[in-house]
Amino acid sequence: MNEAIEPLNPIAFQLGPLAVHWYGIIIGLGALLGLWIAMRESEKRGLQKDTFIDLVLFAIPIAIICARIYYVAFEWDYYAAHPGEIIKIWKGGIAIHGGLIGAILTGYVFSRVKNLSFWKLADIAAPSILLGQAIGRWGNFMNQEAHGEAVSRAFLENLHLPEFIINQMYINGQYYHPTFLYESLWSFVGVIVLLLLRRANLRRGEMFLIYIIWYSIGRYFIEGMRTDSLMLTDSLRIAQVISIVLIVLAVAAIIFRRVKGYSKERYAE
C-alpha cells in the first residue's frame, strides 16, 4: 500500500450546493439511538414518554454549541486569524468535554423547570450519552482526525483491523494509531457496563457519576496517544487534566452523597 490509497469521502451526498458530511450524519445517528434508549427507559421509570424528546431538543444544539466554543477557545490563535472557520463545524473540531458541560447545564435547568429530579434524568441518560460518544467517534474516523502517533502498517495489521480502517489511517503518506477506535470501543464496553449496573439498583445519581468515571479513565489514557490534543501548556493536555478533575469530583460526589444521606433513593424509584 502506498500513496495511491484514497481516503473515504467525508461527504455523504450533495443537496444542490449543500454538502452533507458523514460527520454530521454519524453524530445524528448516535443522538437518535441514544434518545430511543433513554425514552424506553424513562417510561419504565415513571416519566412521560416525551420527557427526553423535550430535553434533547434543547440539550443537543446547546451541547454542540458549547463543544464548539470549548474547542475554539483553546485554539483561539488560529480562529482569531481565520474567523470564518469558526462556524465550519462540519469539518470537525468539537470537544466532548465542552459538549458534556453544555448537556449537564441544560439537563439541570430542564429538571428545575419541569420539577423533576436532575439525578434521575442523568442516570437514565448516562448509557445514551456514552453510546452517542461511541458512535460519534466514527465521525472523526471519516474526517481522518482524532488519531494518534505514526505507526507502521504492520502494527495496524497485527491489531487485525479491517482493511478499510487501516486505509483510512493512511494520512499524508503515513499510517497512524486509530485512537478514535480505542475510545469508541472503550465507550461501547462502558455502555454494556452501565446497562448491567441498572440491575444493581444503585443509589440515585451514581449511574451518571460512574459514567463520568468510566469515560474519564479511558479518555485520560487514550488522550496521551493523540497528536491533535488541545494543549494547556506545551506538555499539558487539557483533556487529561479535565479527566482527572472529573474522576476526583465524581468519586468525591459518590462518597459525599452517601455520607450525608443525600442518595437514599434508588435508581428504580
Swiss-Prot record:
GO biological process, one term: lipoprotein biosynthetic process
Pfam families, alphabetized: LGT
Membrane topology annotation: Multi-pass membrane protein
GO cellular component: plasma membrane
UniProt key word Cell membrane: yes
Role noted for this protein: Catalyzes the transfer of the diacylglyceryl group from phosphatidylglycerol to the sulfhydryl group of the N-terminal cysteine of a prolipoprotein, the first step in the formation of mature lipoproteins. Required for spore germination.
Name of the molecule in the record: Phosphatidylglycerol--prolipoprotein diacylglyceryl transferase
Native species: Bacillus subtilis (strain 168)
Gene name in the database record: lgt
